[in-house]
């Protein structure tokens, strides 16, 4: 008899629910989107109840069509770094403040420079940055005392969902390790981090393993979802670490690279590790599996900007012919040889997280001459996104025990043959595209199989996930990229002061509008 499992991924723009067989075959998937409220350049919030309804409705839609396929468990993936302040009556005092919200930038800088931030990072694994709940809660406590005085708890979006489902405040080690407030070695809240934020452990949820199982879901909500209230719920982990599981990047020497709107690069190691230079994160998958890596802000958004600003006429033609606009862009880029004839693009259109951790860093072209044309700029932009990921990769290799054998590539960019080959050439490594497209949902379910005792290791993953494309590096292209990479890296280091100056100038213009 076939058994089924349901993976739910609470993302920044939508919640996805996927019903799988226990062999990993997709039975059905549903996605429900919601708004990200960005009234100004620094604010990025969501309505937590819209997200909660998306969880209920996406599950209900699947179960309405498959009432005979009750899942043996439901397991969760979630975006990281969100903060919701809750009052004494368990009602939200704030919206869901997302990872993309930069209002705590001033406090992140203060924590890093004046409050022993680097040592806190080394213990907690989360770089000191406005994305981190440590920075966000510190900002609320200091800048919004009218909220802080009423706040009983500071929680993330998955905690909000579980509070409604099970009437408990619980947070898994994975999401907690992305808050900047959990000691990675003791798996307890870090006293110094909490002191910086001005809170106590009572302000935070109870820490539990990513394999923790919850029963007795609220009967009314279970009925709305179309599931048995006794269905086991596995709390799961964060979307990033579960994506590694879902794309089969879990063995030594394997790295997962994702480029969607933003991007990330992540291997798994067996014990927590941080970086003396503060360039990378370290987040929990289980107590014996840790994901190190770096998130980048500038992935597909760079391609979208290039599409809109450099290729509007070509895109209009593509639309009329029914061709994917992004295929047109990569075809244009193919007209130019690797290295874009010496044109470099630093792709920092949205500031940058890893490896620079500088929200002020802007994008720029370098090496532009009269001989460069539009196609050079398009190719340079595509290469710039991969160059930037490669700089994060260099930091990671210092923390890895052994060479990289294979890159598992996912996200929208993995659909592009040109971009995949570019990555193989720049990284000088084999690039494989796994069959799994809903990697975080599948990763959540694989963790659920492990939590419920249906598997005793993650080795089964390779049987669930095939591959669709493979690319080996081309030496001729790799040789050109080897010459250009040091330039790309050295420029971003050399211009640090100028980045701040131009950002201050741009902010002064905004304030005059």
From Swiss-Prot:
GO terms for biological process: D-gluconate metabolic process. Signal peptide: none annotated. It catalyses: D-gluconate + ATP = 6-phospho-D-gluconate + ADP + H(+). Pathway: Carbohydrate acid metabolism; D-gluconate degradation. ATP binds at residues 16, 261, 300, 412-416. Disulfide bonds: none annotated. Keywords: ATP-binding, Gluconate utilization, Kinase, Nucleotide-binding, Transferase. Belongs to the FGGY kinase family. This is Gluconokinase. It comes from Bacillus licheniformis.
């Amino acid at each position: 008899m076939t058994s089924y499992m349901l993976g739910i991924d609470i993302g920044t723009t939508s919640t996805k629910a996927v019903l799988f067989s226990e062999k990993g075959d997709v039975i059905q998937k549903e996605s429900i989107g919601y708004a990200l409220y960005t009234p100004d350049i620094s604010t990025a919030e969501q309505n937590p109840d819209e997200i909660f309804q998306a969880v209920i409705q996406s599950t209900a839609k699947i179960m309405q069509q498959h009432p005979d396929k009750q899942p043996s468990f439901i397991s969760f993936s979630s975006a990281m770094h969100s903060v919701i302040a809750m009052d004494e009556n368990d009602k939200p005092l704030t919206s869901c403040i997302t990872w993309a919200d930069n209002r705590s930038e001033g406090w992140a800088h203060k924590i890093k420079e004046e409050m022993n931030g680097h040592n806190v990072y080394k213990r907690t694994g989360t770089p000191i940055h406005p994305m981190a709940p440590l920075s966000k809660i510190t900002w609320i406590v200091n800048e919004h005392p009218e909220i802080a005085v009423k706040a009983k708890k500071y929680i993330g979006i998955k905690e909000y969902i579980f509070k409604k489902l099970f009437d408990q405040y619980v947070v898994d080690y994975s999401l907690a390790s992305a808050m900047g407030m959990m000691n990675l070695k003791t798996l307890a809240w870090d006293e110094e981090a909490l002191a910086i934020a001005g809170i106590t452990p009572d302000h935070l949820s109870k820490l539990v393993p990513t394999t923790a199982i919850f029963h007795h879901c609220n009967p009314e909500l279970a009925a709305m979802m179309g599931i048995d209230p006794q269905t086991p719920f596995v709390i799961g982990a964060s979307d990033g670490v579960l994506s590694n599981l879902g794309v089969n990047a879990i063995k030594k020497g394997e790295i997962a690279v994702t480029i969607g709107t933003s991007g990330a690069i992540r291997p798994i190691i067996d014990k927590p590790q941080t970086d003396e230079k503060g360039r990378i994160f370290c987040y929990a998958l289980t107590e014996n599996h840790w994901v190190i890596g770096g998130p980048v802000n500038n992935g597909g958004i760079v391609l979208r900007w290039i599409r809109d600003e450099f290729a509007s006429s070509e895109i209009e033609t593509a639309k009329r012919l029914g061709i994917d606009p992004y295929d047109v862009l990569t075809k244009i880029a193919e007209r130019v040889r690797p290295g874009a004839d010496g044109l470099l693009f630093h792709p920092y259109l949205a500031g940058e997280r890893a490896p620079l951790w500088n929200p002020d860093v802007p994008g720029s072209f370098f090496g532009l001459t009269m001989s460069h044309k539009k196609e050079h700029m398009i190719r340079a932009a595509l290469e710039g996104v991969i160059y930037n990921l490669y700089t994060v990769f260099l930091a990671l290799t210092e923390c890895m025990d052994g060479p990289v054998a294979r890159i598992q590539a996912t996200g929208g960019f993995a659909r592009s043959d040109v971009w995949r080959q570019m990555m193989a050439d720049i990284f000088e490594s084999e690039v494989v595209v796994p069959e799994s497209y809903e990697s975080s949902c599948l990763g959540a379910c694989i963790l659920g199989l492990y939590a419920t005792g249906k598997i005793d290791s993650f080795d089964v993953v390779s049987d669930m996930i095939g591959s669709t494309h493979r690319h080996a590096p081309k030496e001729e292209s790799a040789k050109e990229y080897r010459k250009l990479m040091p330039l790309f890296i050295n420029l971003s280091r050399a211009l640090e002061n100028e980045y701040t100056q131009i950002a201050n100038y741009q902010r002064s213009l905004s304030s005059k509008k």
